[in-house]
């Protein structure tokens, strides 16, 4: 039964190759270079002396893109390697999701934001936005880590990316909310989407795999690599698509100080909540990053450096409390099995970030922003909204993100329950040997242990 149900020999090639073929066809029909990457278009502008090579958006955006790309493939990937028997899958399934997600999101977001004359025009900013979209899916992946097959993850990516594009378009273009760092569109949406999927896929007998859900010394060390990369590059993540100049500069500053304050709060509360005053590596790996999430919406606003520190401190406290007290309740009472604790790192800090953004928007005045209001709050600048109205629309955007996450996660969860995606059994969760050739004789030994429902750590 195990060999048949989880065998990827037909399922995985079928889904990967068919979806890649469809994507290539769609790119051939719709996708073209934008004017800054098209040879003829760009050189025509140079010939007309209307621009210079140094003005190409590539030189302004590519450093941020590099940082975001590292976060997606190394940061998120290694952050999930804390599971002692799931390191291959954590990094590699992250790789798989991101590789497909960035292609599909280029199409979906292109239809909403870059569709001109019947074509999708791509450039450096569309690459950044595609990575952002992929980030939301990777957050959802964290909630179901170890309990899903690679085929299930591809299907989830296909649908979630599509819903992300619709949700983002409604929030940014119809509601008119500001969310450059994605507190709502990326973190809140991705976290609660994943949590709802996890709830629908609830495993009553997951205790059969609980012995592998924990970490060991070296797996926690690998996860800290992901933490450090994410922590270092989060200012680039929040500022990557903000306006050039003071907006981007201010976003980096706010994120920088929020993360620093969050880290101190995390260390402090981690020790405080332990009876022996010891630190918990789960808190340090995750909660120390919540400060970046908490200023995703307000980072480009005039939050002030001390305001950013307050936001980061609150995020760190909320996240640690969530890991300590709320995660067990979600599991035992609400039947939400959140492997990575995305509710504590992305969900609650994402909501906090949305609320902070709405509060800061409420106090936006011409005296504070001057002509810079046009970049941050263009509708307030042109008089079509008051600051109070903008604040209310920020709250509305949060509700939209939550609505899409809950409804979309429910639908996707039931789709993933279909018995054709090679999902692992309750006794096979959190185990690489189910889907991977593990080096040496270890893989066969561990798979035998899994089938017999034994604790691998007790085997000679």
UniProtKB/Swiss-Prot annotation:
Cite a single GO MF annotation: ammonium channel activity
Membrane topology term reads: Multi-pass membrane protein
Q: Which intervals lie on the Extracellular side per UniProt? A: 32-62, 109-125, 172-179, 242-252, 305, 369-394
Keywords tagged on the record = Ammonia transport, Cell membrane, Cytoplasmic vesicle, Glycoprotein, Membrane, Transmembrane, Transmembrane helix, Transport
The record's Gene Ontology cellular component field reads: basolateral plasma membrane; cytoplasmic vesicle membrane; plasma membrane
| Major subcellular site | membrane
GO biological process terms, semicolon-separated: ammonium homeostasis; ammonium transmembrane transport
Tell me which InterPro entries the record gives: Ammonium/urea_transptr (IPR029020), NH4_transpt_AmtB-like_dom (IPR024041), RhesusRHD (IPR002229)
Q: Where does this polypeptide localize?
A: Basolateral cell membrane; Cytoplasmic vesicle membrane
Please indicate the ranges of residues that lie on the Cytoplasmic side: 1-10, 84-87, 147-150, 203-220, 274-283, 327-347, 416-460
- Identify one Pfam family in the record: Ammonium_transp
Q: Which domain of life is it from?
A: Eukaryota
Q: Can the keyword Coiled coil be found in this entry's annotation?
A: no
Q: Where are the transmembrane segments?
A: 11-31, 63-83, 88-108, 126-146, 151-171, 180-202, 221-241, 253-273, 284-304, 306-326, 348-368, 395-415
Please explain the role this protein plays, according to its UniProt record. Answer: Functions as a specific ammonium transporter.
Spell out the protein name for this chain.
Ammonium transporter Rh type B-A
Q: Origin organism of this chain? A: Xenopus laevis
Gene coding for it: rhbg-a
